[in-house]
């Protein structure tokens, strides 16, 4: 969703995390929204989401990040999970070649179910485990270039490029929404920012709270 309000934040953007189970999606979520990392995190069951409010080019943006289980038995939630998403972080594990080989399957699913204008970034996670690397950074870069995606290698453990990944996605979404708003205003004087998808009202969660396991 790309939804505009006038009070606590200017925009609410829904971003989905996708990729195989075990690639570190939940720790990316907790690192970005709560600055936490849990070494013994268990596989996600169903869907979780968390929020964080931050500044993007002078605007207050509330990022609503959704995390889903990677296991096939949870694929029934697919259409609802993608509905209204304006950004996606597609994650693979640099130490597990199979998770990289499955990236294109995840891309097909995303493009089948999500809005055609969705902003997608590919992230090679667990860059702190370079000694166990099974996917080169060049391979990741080549695939992302072929598919027209942004690309970074990340480490939720060391907090490497997590902030940059989400800032990049949110900034690109903001640019798209701003262009649509400008076009709408030119077409219809006084038109407001067009909504995308379904707006879901959720309770605000402070992104600055540090609690639970392995707080930093």
From Swiss-Prot:
Annotated compartments: Cell membrane
Positions binding GTP in this chain are 19-26, 67-71, 125-128
Q: How does it sit in the membrane?
A: Lipid-anchor
Lipid moiety-binding residues (S-geranylgeranyl cysteine)? 213-214
Family annotation (Pfam families): Ras
Top-level taxon of origin: Eukaryota
Motif Effector region per record, residues: 41-49
InterPro entries named among the record's database cross-references: P-loop_NTPase, Rab_GTPases_membrane_traffic, Small_GTP-bd, Small_GTPase
Q: Do you know which PROSITE patterns this protein is assigned to? A: RAB
Keywords in UniProt for this one?
Cell membrane, GTP-binding, Lipoprotein, Membrane, Nucleotide-binding, Prenylation
GO terms for CC? plasma membrane
Write out the GO MF terms. Answer: GTP binding; GTPase activity
Q: What family does the Swiss-Prot or TrEMBL record give for this protein? A: Belongs to the small GTPase superfamily. Rab family.
Q: What is this protein called?
A: Ras-related protein Rab11C
């Amino acid at each position: 969703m790309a939804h505009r309000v006038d009070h606590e934040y200017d925009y609410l953007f829904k971003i989905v995390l996708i990729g195989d189970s075990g690639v570190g999606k939940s720790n990316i979520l907790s690192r970005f929204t709560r600055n936490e990392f849990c070494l013994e995190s268990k596989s996600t069951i169903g869907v979780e989401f968390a929020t964080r409010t931050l500044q993007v080019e002078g605007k207050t943006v509330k990022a609503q990040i959704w995390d889903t289980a990677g296991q096939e038995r949870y694929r029934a939630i697919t259409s609802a999970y993608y509905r209204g998403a304006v950004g996606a972080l597609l994650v693979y594990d640099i130490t597990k070649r199979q998770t990289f080989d499955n990236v294109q399957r995840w891309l097909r699913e995303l493009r089948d179910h999500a809005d055609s204008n969705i902003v997608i970034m590919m992230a090679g996670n667990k860059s702190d485990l370079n000694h166990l690397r099974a996917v080169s950074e060049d391979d990741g870069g080549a695939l992302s270039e072929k598919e027209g995606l942004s690309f970074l290698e990340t480490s939720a453990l060391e907090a490497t490029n997590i902030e940059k990944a989400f800032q990049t996605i949110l900034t690109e979404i903001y640019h798209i929404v701003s262009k649509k708003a400008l076009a709408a205003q030119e077409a219809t004087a006084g038109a407001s920012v067009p909504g995308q998808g379904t707006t879901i009202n959720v309770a605000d969660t402070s992104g600055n709270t540090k609690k639970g396991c392995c707080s930093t």
